[in-house]
Protein backbone atom coordinates (compact mmCIF):
# COMPACT_ATOMS: atom_id res chain seq x y z
CA UNK A 1 0.00 0.00 0.00
CA UNK A 2 1.32 3.43 -0.88
CA UNK A 3 1.05 6.27 1.63
CA UNK A 4 0.53 9.55 -0.22
CA UNK A 5 3.10 12.19 0.63
CA UNK A 6 2.57 15.61 -0.83
CA UNK A 7 5.61 17.64 -1.78
CA UNK A 8 4.96 21.34 -2.23
CA UNK A 9 6.68 23.17 -5.08
CA UNK A 10 7.60 26.58 -3.68
CA UNK A 11 9.88 27.71 -6.51
CA UNK A 12 7.97 28.45 -9.72
CA UNK A 13 10.98 27.48 -11.86
CA UNK A 14 10.24 23.84 -10.98
CA UNK A 15 7.68 22.60 -13.47
CA UNK A 16 8.47 25.47 -15.85
CA UNK A 17 12.21 25.88 -16.44
CA UNK A 18 13.05 22.56 -14.78
CA UNK A 19 11.02 19.34 -14.75
CA UNK A 20 9.06 18.26 -11.71
CA UNK A 21 10.94 15.75 -9.56
CA UNK A 22 10.12 12.23 -10.69
CA UNK A 23 11.21 8.65 -10.27
CA UNK A 24 13.38 7.89 -13.32
CA UNK A 25 12.28 4.25 -13.59
CA UNK A 26 9.58 2.08 -11.96
CA UNK A 27 12.31 0.63 -9.73
CA UNK A 28 13.83 3.96 -8.66
CA UNK A 29 13.99 4.44 -4.89
CA UNK A 30 14.79 8.14 -4.98
CA UNK A 31 14.01 11.26 -6.96
CA UNK A 32 16.52 13.98 -7.76
CA UNK A 33 16.59 17.32 -5.96
CA UNK A 34 17.82 20.40 -7.81
CA UNK A 35 19.83 23.43 -6.74
CA UNK A 36 17.26 26.22 -6.85
CA UNK A 37 19.77 29.01 -6.43
CA UNK A 38 19.48 32.49 -7.95
CA UNK A 39 22.86 32.48 -9.69
CA UNK A 40 25.61 29.96 -10.33
CA UNK A 41 27.90 29.61 -7.34
CA UNK A 42 31.44 28.40 -6.85
CA UNK A 43 31.93 25.98 -3.97
CA UNK A 44 35.57 26.22 -2.95
CA UNK A 45 37.58 23.20 -1.74
CA UNK A 46 36.56 22.25 1.83
CA UNK A 47 33.67 24.74 1.74
CA UNK A 48 30.17 23.74 2.85
CA UNK A 49 27.10 25.61 1.59
CA UNK A 50 23.37 25.24 2.21
CA UNK A 51 21.38 24.96 -1.02
CA UNK A 52 17.59 25.46 -1.35
CA UNK A 53 15.66 22.85 -3.35
CA UNK A 54 12.46 24.79 -3.98
CA UNK A 55 10.46 21.93 -2.45
CA UNK A 56 8.72 21.92 0.93
CA UNK A 57 7.63 18.80 2.74
CA UNK A 58 5.48 17.57 5.60
CA UNK A 59 5.51 13.77 5.77
CA UNK A 60 2.97 13.83 8.65
CA UNK A 61 2.90 10.02 9.02
CA UNK A 62 5.11 9.05 12.01
CA UNK A 63 5.71 5.62 10.47
CA UNK A 64 7.67 7.30 7.64
CA UNK A 65 10.69 9.58 7.28
CA UNK A 66 12.46 11.13 4.32
CA UNK A 67 16.19 10.97 3.71
CA UNK A 68 18.34 13.16 1.50
CA UNK A 69 21.16 11.16 -0.03
CA UNK A 70 24.09 12.11 -2.28
CA UNK A 71 24.10 11.43 -6.00
CA UNK A 72 26.98 9.06 -6.69
CA UNK A 73 28.30 10.93 -9.73
CA UNK A 74 28.59 14.23 -7.86
CA UNK A 75 30.82 12.67 -5.21
CA UNK A 76 32.82 10.38 -7.48
CA UNK A 77 33.43 12.80 -10.36
CA UNK A 78 33.48 16.17 -8.57
CA UNK A 79 33.98 15.55 -4.83
CA UNK A 80 30.60 17.14 -4.02
CA UNK A 81 28.95 15.25 -1.16
CA UNK A 82 26.43 16.07 1.54
CA UNK A 83 27.91 18.12 4.36
CA UNK A 84 26.01 16.01 6.89
CA UNK A 85 26.47 12.79 4.84
CA UNK A 86 22.74 11.93 5.06
CA UNK A 87 19.88 14.32 5.74
CA UNK A 88 17.12 12.85 7.90
CA UNK A 89 13.72 14.53 7.60
CA UNK A 90 11.42 13.64 10.50
CA UNK A 91 7.71 13.20 9.84
CA UNK A 92 6.82 16.31 11.84
CA UNK A 93 9.22 18.65 10.00
CA UNK A 94 7.42 21.22 7.88
CA UNK A 95 9.37 23.43 5.53
CA UNK A 96 11.69 23.68 2.57
CA UNK A 97 14.20 20.91 1.96
CA UNK A 98 17.73 22.27 2.05
CA UNK A 99 20.84 20.39 0.98
CA UNK A 100 24.16 20.83 2.75
CA UNK A 101 26.84 20.52 0.03
CA UNK A 102 30.48 19.99 0.89
CA UNK A 103 33.30 20.20 -1.64
CA UNK A 104 35.73 17.54 -0.39
CA UNK A 105 37.92 17.90 -3.50
CA UNK A 106 40.94 20.14 -3.99
CA UNK A 107 39.31 22.02 -6.89
CA UNK A 108 36.58 24.68 -6.95
CA UNK A 109 33.23 23.38 -8.25
CA UNK A 110 30.66 25.54 -10.01
CA UNK A 111 27.08 24.67 -9.09
CA UNK A 112 24.70 25.87 -11.78
CA UNK A 113 21.06 26.87 -11.33
CA UNK A 114 18.92 23.74 -11.47
CA UNK A 115 21.76 21.22 -11.18
CA UNK A 116 20.66 17.88 -9.73
CA UNK A 117 22.67 17.64 -6.53
CA UNK A 118 21.01 15.08 -4.22
CA UNK A 119 18.18 12.59 -4.09
CA UNK A 120 15.17 12.19 -1.84
CA UNK A 121 13.70 8.91 -0.71
CA UNK A 122 11.18 7.78 1.87
CA UNK A 123 11.78 5.04 4.42
CA UNK A 124 9.71 3.26 7.06
CA UNK A 125 10.30 4.17 10.71
CA UNK A 126 10.06 1.83 13.66
CA UNK A 127 10.45 3.53 17.02
CA UNK A 128 12.17 1.42 19.66
CA UNK A 129 11.12 0.99 23.27
CA UNK A 130 13.57 0.56 26.11
CA UNK A 131 13.69 -1.91 28.97
CA UNK A 132 16.09 -1.56 31.88
CA UNK A 133 17.69 -4.99 32.47
CA UNK A 134 20.28 -6.49 34.80
CA UNK A 135 21.58 -8.95 32.20
CA UNK A 136 21.34 -9.72 28.51
CA UNK A 137 21.17 -13.17 26.92
CA UNK A 138 24.27 -14.02 24.90
CA UNK A 139 24.29 -15.22 21.30
CA UNK A 140 26.73 -17.19 19.14
CA UNK A 141 28.00 -13.92 17.67
CA UNK A 142 28.54 -12.29 21.04
CA UNK A 143 29.55 -8.69 21.61
CA UNK A 144 32.18 -8.41 18.88
CA UNK A 145 32.14 -4.93 17.39
CA UNK A 146 33.69 -3.34 14.33
CA UNK A 147 35.39 -5.89 12.10
CA UNK A 148 34.39 -8.79 14.36
CA UNK A 149 33.07 -10.97 11.54
CA UNK A 150 36.12 -10.42 9.30
CA UNK A 151 36.34 -9.61 5.60
CA UNK A 152 36.38 -13.09 3.99
Curated annotation (Swiss-Prot):
InterPro entries the record matches = dUTPase, dUTPase-like, dUTPase-like_sf, dUTPase_trimeric
Question: What is the E.C. number?
Answer: 3.6.1.23
Residues the record lists as binding substrate? 71-73, 84, 88-90, 98
Q: Name any one Pfam family assigned in the record.
A: dUTPase
Q: Which reaction does it catalyse?
A: dUTP + H2O = dUMP + diphosphate + H(+)
Keyword entries, A-Z: Hydrolase, Magnesium, Metal-binding, Nucleotide metabolism
GO BP annotations of the record are: dUMP biosynthetic process; dUTP catabolic process
Q: Does the keyword DNA repair apply?
A: no
Q: In which pathway does it act?
A: Pyrimidine metabolism; dUMP biosynthesis; dUMP from dCTP (dUTP route): step 2/2
Q: Which PANTHER family match?
A: DEOXYURIDINE 5'-TRIPHOSPHATE NUCLEOTIDOHYDROLASE
Of which family is this protein a member?
Belongs to the dUTPase family.
Q: What is this protein called?
A: Deoxyuridine 5'-triphosphate nucleotidohydrolase
Query: From which organism does this entry originate?
Result: Shewanella frigidimarina (strain NCIMB 400)
Which lineage?
A: Bacteria, Pseudomonadati, Pseudomonadota, Gammaproteobacteria, Alteromonadales
